């Protein structure tokens, strides 16, 4: 059926405005950019065909209960997101453009990102924005980069919409809603029943088991009892330090016996072995390994890395980031990408070293939808400092996977001192290979001493180095993402958001993650009364079933029915212990609000909320007997550090974050509060200890002109 103009009307729907601009420019360079209100769209007319390119802005629709007055919400519907979340009012303008200019077309092309979320975004926009009829006229573009060539190829070779992706995506949203919303409401109801107070609490299908993992580690660290041990070390000539082959020695008497036995003896060289070890090139980045590497190299949070990688993809500089693949198929065009990258001398010097046929060293992980993360060959014209860091990391990784093996040489020397066996080793790179193209790896280059079997070496001293066993290491964001992946919790796209939510809820804090008392008490309470909420196995089961929905092995409705049954069981457990749960949660919440001691009466200073003023403040727990009160600036955080002048807690506030005393009358000026910890390696200004969402960090005083930051533990020397 033709439109009223007599021309066949085709609509291309994209996920985001920037993507729609890229796709319009690649397919129809002379397309006319138009505006309806604040929203842009594109039109192209050629012969008897009219094409309209419109954009979503992420999800246009979200879930809500059909009846908002029910006790529990299991009957849900999709509704425009701006009707549910008032902060999303801007979405209405995009939806209006789709309804006005896309409805009633002859043909639709779904051109959102090719993943579960992208497929669901486009499906809902078409179904609810253009009507059910639109779905029968829809085909799908599949692309992994927003380059002109790939967009044109995807347009000329459309595929069918993957309804397995649609159902899996919809089921995930429904499961997250019925778990998260119902259980969170039930927990808040328990507090209301026990104390007649309202506090905001949050639980989630993946969020709560993740918090439980962190609580388990917190308890392991707290319960750990360090045990002393000794390492016997011998100092020889030429800066050589050899260690006893006994390793850790836990008995002091044995240590004394060994030291006495070694006294006055030379070191006899028993064996010298030099061997070569091949170190293969790294594998291409999937999202998880990119996040881990960016955290290791730059200290970037996984969420920050994911956001930057998405921006680089949208600009057309790198491929789609939310991939599990460590494979680089030949079809991406290795030679063309490398040839274009070589136009930048910084990359060209490394590309020139590549020898022989181009064959990437690939990893085991695969993804049906997208290849590993790689540069497209399009050189950026302008990037922010952090975008440049991530882009360079991706490019160097891509080049290095085609590199030659590196060869590491290891020297192992075994010695005997007074009949006690010692050894030492040295390492050096004999062939750099791929390591020359990947500057983020450490190239060891230790000097090998000229020693042969039978030599006798003078011993300068033999001593015992006393140490203690250490507790398990705290998770950081990168290691937690790896742990969640190992345990099968969450997805590549959601894990960073889950961790960010735990920070936002104040359940965890710090780069080396610590669980707050509130976070720990929530898990302890849930473990006692309704352990199923924190069950990893239940979460894994639903992750497997969501995957099975996508592959057509199980129906969406069956999985949703299973989830409703499980949630009803959890809600029943909470209801049976409603007041006990509420009392414990409220006690934990109250403890988490204590920030110090009242200087007037010795009571507790507590963070409070004023409904009348809609603001938080710090007041004494002994109110009304004690009326000590301190206002808090909007968005302020109370820190653990204390004011050197009056002993009250410090606060951080403003953009960029400033630190000051809780008491504005203290007289502690901002300039006095700033703690200089070094010099910025990029601009030479002072480095200042600051406070932010993840706790304390170090930033350049030259902000915003210089945006250098690092953790408190990584302050550059000099």
Curated annotation (Swiss-Prot):
Residue positions binding Mg(2+): 15, 113
Keyword vocabulary terms for this entry: DNA-binding, Isomerase, Magnesium, Metal-binding, Repeat, Topoisomerase, Zinc, Zinc-finger
InterPro entries: Topo_IA, Topo_IA_2, Topo_IA_AS, Topo_IA_cen, Topo_IA_cen_sub1, Topo_IA_cen_sub2, Topo_IA_cen_sub3, Topo_IA_core_domain
Subunit structure: Monomer.
PROSITE patterns according to UniProt: TOPO_IA_1, TOPO_IA_2, TOPRIM
GO molecular function: DNA binding; DNA topoisomerase type I (single strand cut, ATP-independent) activity; zinc ion binding
Superkingdom of origin: Archaea
UniProt region (Interaction with DNA), positions on chain: 202-207
Catalytic residues, chain numbering: 320 (o-(5'-phospho-dna)-tyrosine intermediate)
Domain Toprim residue range list: 9-151
Cellular compartments per GO CC: chromosome
Catalytic activity as recorded in UniProt: ATP-independent breakage of single-stranded DNA, followed by passage and rejoining
BP GO annotations: DNA recombination; DNA repair; DNA topological change
Domain Topo IA-type catalytic: 162-571
The protein's Enzyme Commission number: 5.6.2.1
Originating organism: Methanothermobacter thermautotrophicus (strain ATCC 29096 / DSM 1053 / JCM 10044 / NBRC 100330 / Delta H)
Family: Belongs to the type IA topoisomerase family.
CDD domains noted in UniProt: TOP1Ac
Zn-finger segments (C4-type): 598-626, 680-706
Main EC class the enzyme belongs to: isomerase
Protein name as catalogued: DNA topoisomerase 1
Region annotated Disordered, chain positions: 361-380
Extent of Basic and acidic residues compositional bias: 361-371
Cofactor: Mg(2+)
Function text: Releases the supercoiling and torsional tension of DNA, which is introduced during the DNA replication and transcription, by transiently cleaving and rejoining one strand of the DNA duplex. Introduces a single-strand break via transesterification at a target site in duplex DNA. The scissile phosphodiester is attacked by the catalytic tyrosine of the enzyme, resulting in the formation of a DNA-(5'-phosphotyrosyl)-enzyme intermediate and the expulsion of a 3'-OH DNA strand. The free DNA strand then undergoes passage around the unbroken strand, thus removing DNA supercoils.
Site (Interaction with DNA): 59, 172, 176, 322, 505
Keyword Zinc: yes
